């Protein structure tokens, strides 16, 4: 289950209803998928063949199509990151820069962990959203944020897009301190 840490205040928000309410107040969609649907051989596996990626997409076909229908997503894929990922450090450097997108950034975590650092409203400032398997998040179009891995340095996620070109980040020049 996702955990939120507000950087300015140190406040920690836990529990699905509390997390959903806080994220909703910040314009961020949060849902939770039943991760027990995932076949055992794909749980906690971070190096995936194309066939295994397709199996994950097929497992969550109904959830993906429902989310796509509600929010206008047209294409989806799987991203898998771990220490076995070629050029992982370069990818993380790219992901860890504060940026925006011209569409929502949607991730449904199917294994592992990740953190979105999201700019909230003026009063809230930046907050971390620690995600684990089953958590689904959609950072709104134009909202400054970045993503990184947690200490275990491994995640598998379904990504949904409106634009077929996929993940396209636009740098965001931050005027406030991200870490406080």
Curated annotation (Swiss-Prot):
Its EC number is 1.13.11.54, 1.13.11.53. Fe(2+) binds at residues 99, 101, 105, 145. Belongs to the acireductone dioxygenase (ARD) family. The record marks 107 as: Important to generate the dianion. It is an enzyme of class 1 (oxidoreductase). Ni(2+) binds at residues 99, 101, 105, 145. CDD domains: cupin_ARD (cd02232). Binds 1 Fe(2+) cation per monomer. This is Acireductone dioxygenase. GO terms for biological process: L-methionine salvage from methylthioadenosine; L-methionine salvage from S-adenosylmethionine. Its cofactor is Fe(2+); Ni(2+). It catalyses: 1,2-dihydroxy-5-(methylsulfanyl)pent-1-en-3-one + O2 = 3-(methylsulfanyl)propanoate + CO + formate + 2 H(+); 1,2-dihydroxy-5-(methylsulfanyl)pent-1-en-3-one + O2 = 4-methylsulfanyl-2-oxobutanoate + formate + 2 H(+). Catalyzes 2 different reactions between oxygen and the acireductone 1,2-dihydroxy-3-keto-5-methylthiopentene (DHK-MTPene) depending upon the metal bound in the active site. Fe-containing acireductone dioxygenase (Fe-ARD) produces formate and 2-keto-4-methylthiobutyrate (KMTB), the alpha-ketoacid precursor of methionine in the methionine recycle pathway. Ni-containing acireductone dioxygenase (Ni-ARD) produces methylthiopropionate, carbon monoxide and formate, and does not lie on the methionine recycle pathway. It comes from Geobacillus thermodenitrificans (strain NG80-2). Keywords: Amino-acid biosynthesis, Dioxygenase, Iron, Metal-binding, Methionine biosynthesis, Nickel, Oxidoreductase. Monomer. It comes from the Bacteria. Pathway: Amino-acid biosynthesis; L-methionine biosynthesis via salvage pathway; L-methionine from S-methyl-5-thio-alpha-D-ribose 1-phosphate: step 5/6. The record marks 104 as: May play a role in transmitting local conformational changes.
